[in-house]
Amino acid sequence: MKRQNQSCVVEFILLGFSNFPELQVQLFGVFLVIYVVTLMGNAIITVIISLNQSLHVPMYLFLLNLSVVEVSFSAVITPEMLVVLSTEKTMISFVGCFAQMYFILLFGGTECFLLGAMAYDRFAAICHPLNYPVIMNRGVFMKLVIFSWISGIMVATVQTTWVFSFPFCGPNEINHLFCETPPVLELVCADTFLFEIYAFTGTILIVMVPFLLILLSYIRVLFAILKMPSTTGRQKAFSTCASHLTSVTLFYGTANMTYLQPKSGYSPETKKLISLAYTLLTPLLNPLIYSLRNSEMKRTLIKLWRRKVILHTF
């Protein structure tokens, strides 16, 4: 591709919240704390599951993969946001913007499918406990995880390559916190109708279909919970399901609002706030919701902490 014939833009400017300079320092502090807590929470989960052989079962190995995705997702996005918030104008090269968009789509797409696989795993465990070892054997688990990662790679490769094959004639100011498809697409000086059809169809398949499957799985799970004889058990199960559904609704709902119609009528500031839900909040909440409330995870964490204290004592 001859870049000079197709595009005169060699770098982009990320504007961030430049319309609200008085808020940027406070936002920098909040985002930094969220980033550190996200990394720590997901790192703890990764270490706990990796070191405890008894947790090497599909349920926890799915969590391990989710934690890797969340750490990677945050590492691709948040440092750039912090730079944007700490400077008046942040420059990012054409190649740098391409790379960031690619990895955002890779990890975001992988998470969409991975959360669906995790919901299926919980559905099989709760609704078909006797057949669970057969339904979710190691082979099925590996296929679901590999499918999630390969799907994420394919989504990222197709969408990013397509977006950056368009000509960019200027202006080069991206009114966003990072290089994401919708705000970058607004700078394209060509007809993007076919891409928008692809984006609409792709979002339905990648975001809406897994989300609907998750909802159906949890409806079946809720019916199974209602049959539990123990009131305490029902309350605990309902609480867990409610927190899981809150997390997936936040993630899929906001991602759907962003990607279903890339050139939607939302204001730039609204788009930024929506994007923060699935780029900042869900990576922060998922460790708390999926893992740190889990009794087995907490027991393992306490054991590791005690072992560390004993080693330091001697």
UniProtKB/Swiss-Prot annotation:
GO molecular function, a single term: olfactory receptor activity
Membrane topology: Multi-pass membrane protein
Transmembrane segments: 26-46, 55-75, 100-120, 140-160, 198-217, 238-258, 272-292
SS bond list: C97-C189
Lipoprotein in keyword set: no
Membrane topology, Cytoplasmic segments: 47-54, 121-139, 218-237, 293-314
Protein's cellular compartments: Cell membrane
Membrane side Extracellular: residue ranges: 1-25, 76-99, 161-197, 259-271
GO cellular component, one term: plasma membrane
Keyword vocabulary terms for this entry: Cell membrane, Disulfide bond, G-protein coupled receptor, Glycoprotein, Membrane, Olfaction, Receptor, Sensory transduction, Transducer, Transmembrane, Transmembrane helix
GO terms for biological process, alphabetical: detection of chemical stimulus involved in sensory perception of smell; sensory perception of smell
PANTHER family for this protein: OLFACTORY RECEPTOR
Family: Belongs to the G-protein coupled receptor 1 family.
Task performed by this protein: Odorant receptor.
Protein's name according to its UniProt entry: Olfactory receptor 10A3
Organism: Homo sapiens (Human)
Gene: OR10A3
